[in-house]
Regions:
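Beta-sandwich/jelly-roll carbohydrate-recognition scaffolds of carbohydrate-active enzymes
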Residues: 2-311, 321
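C-terminal capping/lid segments that line or modulate ligand- or cofactor-binding pockets
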Residues: 24-57, 61, 354, 404-405, ...
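Non-catalytic C-terminal accessory modules of carbohydrate-active enzymes
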Residues: 77-131, 610-614, 621-622, 629, ...
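Structured secondary-structure scaffolds
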Residues: 295-370, 534-538, 545, 564, ...
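Structural helix-adjacent loops and short alpha-helical linkers that scaffold large soluble proteins
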Residues: 303-310, 326-328, 361-372, 433-448, ...
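Helix-terminus loop motifs that line ligand-binding clefts
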Residues: 324-339, 365-427, 433, 440-444, ...
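The feature captures the catalytic groove of carbohydrate-active enzymes
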Residues: 339-347, 396-435, 439-444, 455-534, ...
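Active-site core of glycosidic bond-cleaving carbohydrate-active enzymes
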Residues: 347-353, 357-376, 500, 507, ...
Length: 760
């Protein structure tokens, strides 16, 4: 764990010493992004110590050939990965001929690095003594422009402190890069062309192209340009007296074939770099500050009295804002965002289950709708994916892992069996419409997805003569510490719900949008009468395991046959168990990776009374090791709902500081960005008690003991609501048309520009 290594501050991430053993972790935590590209917090100058260079362009992928021990029919041929792109931030430095390299300097006298989360600016300040005895102060400032999404900016200042010195700068772009996670150690890029100030590359197989150009400034410099394959470098040396800084400015244009013709890429990148140079560093920084202020305006959360909780939630929101802006339907939210290579930068069910509610409430319906359209645009691929596994008649199975709609995951127990992801796609449509009231989406796109998903479920079930019930065999639920089980409760429940919702939606479209209904029936060969009858018959006849004595739903058949070990009784040396135990031992244990039954009780909370939720929570949370980043948030929300605020707060801190404190000892691989949306849910739905019932936004707030107050904003049906909660009252300010709200069970109408106070 990080043990306080990252200092607590409400708006900044700060490390105040240089620890080479934490370099990889800090590269993840201090990563930057602007929604279309991003990168790890690598040092600009050469660093010969342990590092994972990482710069990524959203939407660009490489089909890395699948690597498995035993090929099974139906496996995907490749895993689509976001390739590590050119190292555009590079600025090598030498002082009186001695290279600056933190791994080899004589002494690091001081080191300070911060990310200013208000404006997504990374600053580093250090004093070092080089091997030749020269002591220098170094300050770097870096950001990816939110206002100009193809521009990266670096300021690099070196000041000799104990004598005059000659300082050599070599700003460069290096496109000769590899992915650490390449299955066969292949390079994903090949050179197209390299010129004095720019280089262009193409991804092998997938054919995406990108270009990087740099424009540089340094007072008194005469530049010498060096061009080698895939590398652009400019070098200049300047003399500075003791105490006088040499300041380099670097403006990088980063353009891809997603937005430009390949033949125009170098010209486009040069134009971006030149326009940045013309604007100048200070003006660009002002633009950045203003653009980020606008982003924060609708989504900041303020927590009174708890600095660690405050920093944690802002860090989570910040990473989400850096990762996705909703400007492009081709983009989505990878589990690591732009912070690392793990999971390939691709889309999982995390987007629908966790991220959509955050963007719904903070960015508005248009941005959230883009996430749904992303899946709609990939529906035909989902139908192809299902057909490869033997399903027919337009049944769709959305991939577990994807960039372009094709399945990329190559573990059979996940690819073939973790089919609950289909339910998450359907639930996201329901959640979007419930929150926005945008029923038109059903006719525009949603019904086609819903009926295709329902067709899959109708074919995936089996009739059990012994039970006289429909059963769901051979699945993996959200708890991935169980594979190939029968009758996973969550999978069966969301399957039944999906079929019912598809039938309900078909009726709505038929009655309200008859022309669209006819179009959909023809396009998808949909026979509503026959198909919905079958769906409802299955939903009404599904088997669900339960233990009446314990009063719980059974996670799957045979779960109570396992030795009932509690998570609290594990030896700390065995944690996390996925890094300590054999997979055989994990599968035979009762220990749970993340919410499974409880995921269903969270999604469908209105279907169950609090006593049912409480019994299941007490039983399953005690057996949960929370070794998925997606786990603590769901448990925190449910704990708050049943009134266990101490447990809710404990789990909230775990989810919100999962990466800052490195609970699972893996932040070096990248941050858990999609689960950060769950951290937001923990605050707003957990302690804020926000839910939507019958089209009405309701709040049932409860503050943990450590908090004095909680404030947040939500965009609900084009009204921006500011909610402030204290021990004794709730205050809601409305910016927009009058809106009906429910607070602690009492409904009230709030007019525009009105602040309503309610005692608790």
């Amino acid at each position: 764990m990080n043990d306080g290594y990252v200092k607590t501050d409400p708006w900044r991430l700060v490390e105040d010493r240089f620890d080479p053993s934490r370099t990889l972790s800090s590269e993840s935590l201090f990563a930057l992004g602007n929604g279309v590209m991003g990168g790890r917090a690598n040092f600009e100058e050469r660093y010969s110590g342990e590092t994972l260079q990482g710069n990524y362009i959203g939407g660009v992928y490489y089909p890395d050939k699948t690597r498995v021990g035993w090929w099974k029919n139906g496996y995907p041929e490749y895993f689509a990965k976001v390739p590590n792109a050119a190292f555009w931030i590079g600025v090598d430095v030498a002082v009186d001929g001695e290279p600056l390299d933190l791994a080899t300097v004589a002494e690091v006298k001081s080191f300070y690095r911060e990310t200013d989360m208000r404006r997504s600016v990374l600053t580093r300040r250090m004093r070092v003594v080089l091997k030749n005895g020269v002591e220098v102060a170094v300050e770097t400032v870096r950001f990816l422009s939110l206002a100009r999404r193809e521009l990266g900016v670096v300021k690099y200042a070196v000041t000799p402190l104990n004598r005059a010195a000659r300082i050599t700068f070599s700003p460069h772009v290096d496109a000769d890069v590899r992915n650490a996670d390449a299955n066969y150690d292949e390079k994903f890029w090949e050179e197209v062309s390299t010129e004095a100030d720019a280089t262009q590359s193409r991804t092998k197989k997938s054919g995406f192209e990108a270009a990087w150009a740099q424009a540089v400034e340094l007072d008194g410099a005469e530049w010498h340009c060096e061009t080698r394959p895939e590398k652009v470098r400019a070098t200049a040396a300047v003399s500075r007296e003791k105490g006088c800084a040499a300041v380099l400015y670097k403006y990088a244009g980063i353009c891809s074939s997603l937005n430009h013709a390949p033949a125009d890429l170098i010209a486009a990148a040069r134009a971006v770099a030149a326009s940045g140079q013309e604007a100048g560093f200070e003006a660009l920084l002002e633009e950045q500050t203003a653009a980020w202020a606008a982003r924060w305006h609708g989504c900041d959360i303020e927590i009174g009295g708890d600095a660690r909780a405050q920093q944690g939630i802002r860090f989570c929101i910040f990473m989400l804002l850096q990762t996705y802006t909703g400007v492009d339907t081709r983009l989505n939210i990878g589990p690591k965002g732009f912070t690392g290579e793990k999971y390939g930068g691709v889309t999982y069910w995390d987007t629908e289950a966790y991220c959509l509610p955050f963007y719904l409430a903070t960015a508005g319906r248009a941005v959230a709708r883009e996430l749904l359209v992303y899946r709609y645009n990939q529906l035909d691929k989902a139908i192809e994916n299902a057909a490869k596994l033997g399903f027919r008649d337009g049944a769709a199975l959305y991939p577990m892992v994807t960039v372009n709609g094709e399945e990329c995951h190559n573990e059979w127990e996940i690819t073939f069996e973790e089919i609950h992801r289909n339910g998450a796609v359907a639930y996201a449509i329901f959640n979007y419409i419930r929150y926005t009231g945008d029923t038109a989406y059903l006719a525009d796109c949603g019904l086609e997805v819903l009926l295709s998903v329902a067709r899959f479920w109708a074919q995936r079930i089996t009739w059990s003569g012994a039970r006289q019930k429909y059963v769901m065999l051979g699945v993996t639920g959200p708890n991935e510490y169980e594979n190939n089980v029968d009758n996973n409760w969550y999978t069966s429940y969301i399957a039944c719900w999906s079929m019912r919702y598809a039938a309900e939606s078909a009726a709505w479209v038929r009655e309200n949008r008859p022309a669209d209904y006819a179009r959909i029936c023809a396009k998808r060969r949909f026979d509503e009468t026959a198909e919905t009858k079958r769906w409802l018959e299955i939903a009404d006849g599904m088997y669900f395991g339960e233990d009446r004595e314990l009063g719980i739903f059974l996670q799957q058949d045979g779960y109570l046959d396992k030795e009932q070990t509690l998570a609290k009784d594990l030896d700390p040396a065995d944690r996390p168990i996925n890094q300590r135990w054999s997979w055989d031992r994990i599968l035979r244990s009762c220990l749970i990776k993340q919410a499974d039954v409880l995921q269903g009780l969270y999604f469908f909370g209105d279907d169950f009374d609090l006593d049912t939720v409480r019994r299941n929570f007490r039983f399953y949370e005690a057996r949960t090791v929370h070794e998925s980043s997606l786990s603590p948030c769901v448990h925190a929300i449910l704990a708050a709902r049943i009134g266990d605020l101490d447990k809710a707060y404990e789990l909230y801190l775990r989810t919100v500081r999962l990466d800052l404190d490195d609970y699972n000892r893996e932040v070096r691989e990248g941050c858990h960005v999609t689960s950060m949306a769950g951290s937001w849910l923990s605050v707003v739905e957990g302690f804020g008690g926000m839910r939507v019932r019958d089209g009405v936004l309701s709040f049932d707030p409860q503050l943990p003991a450590a908090w004095e107050s909680l404030s947040f904003k939500v965009n609900f049906r084009d009204r921006v609501l500011t909610v402030r909660i204290t021990r004794n009252a709730v205050e809601v300010a409305n910016e927009g048309a009058p809106v009906e709200l429910e607070i602690r069970g009492v409904r009230r109408l709030i007019a525009d520009k009105v602040i309503m106070n309610c005692e608790l």
